[in-house]
Amino acid sequence: YTPLAAHASMEPPVAVAEYREGTVTIWAPTQNPQAVQDTVSAALGIDKKNVECHVTLLGGGFGRKSKPDYVAEAALLSRELGKPVKVTWTREDDIRYDYYHAVAAMYMKAAVDEKGRPTAWLQRSAFPSIGSTFAGPSAPSAQYGAGFELGMGWTNVPFDIPNHRAENGPAKAHVRIGWLRSVANI
């Protein structure tokens, strides 16, 4: 069993936005400036060519800073207040509204030969897919996981395992699911 895990980045989500006459300029530590343009333009009802994003240094994002919800908040506030706005989330809000690494339940079974080399590996798992965030909750990949998710961890195993099988069952996401970038396969 793997529990939900929050990113808890060194710095909480923060953004500065300045809205002027149908355009907005953003300064934010983001891992995905294109998503900033898409999300902010949709939130403000403007063309994404009118969203300028300056990427600042970020104190560890681990995948969390690829989701621009905090940036859209700053842009909306700037438009409503008619002046530049800086939004800094509290640590409590950062944890509460994170895109969590998915909870997972797994069963694993392996076999080794007389020399201790792995000969077989069976892995059964159930986890909410990242597809629930990107493709929407009704997409098939949101329930069963996408192929790339099932392959993570299999592509760089340091052993030649002649017999391996990975099975995945459905699991619904009850919170926002997101990438949790880290060392190795997490």
Residue ranges and their predicted role:
Residues 15-81, 138-152, 181-186:
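Alpha-helical support elements that line or immediately flank enzyme active sites
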Residues 1-5, 87-94, 141:
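Short Pro/Gly-enriched beta-strand edge/turn motifs at strand-loop
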Residues 5-9, 69:
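Short secondary-structure boundary/capping elements
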Residues 35-41, 46, 93-185:
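Gly/Pro-rich active-site capping loops and adjacent beta-alpha segments
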Residues 11-15, 105:
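Short glycine-rich loop/turn motifs
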Residues 26, 49-56, 83-92, 119-124, ...:
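Beta-strand segments within the central parallel beta-sheet cores of soluble alpha/beta enzyme folds
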Residues 8-10, 100-101:
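Short glycine/proline-enriched turns and hinge-like loops at secondary-structure junctions
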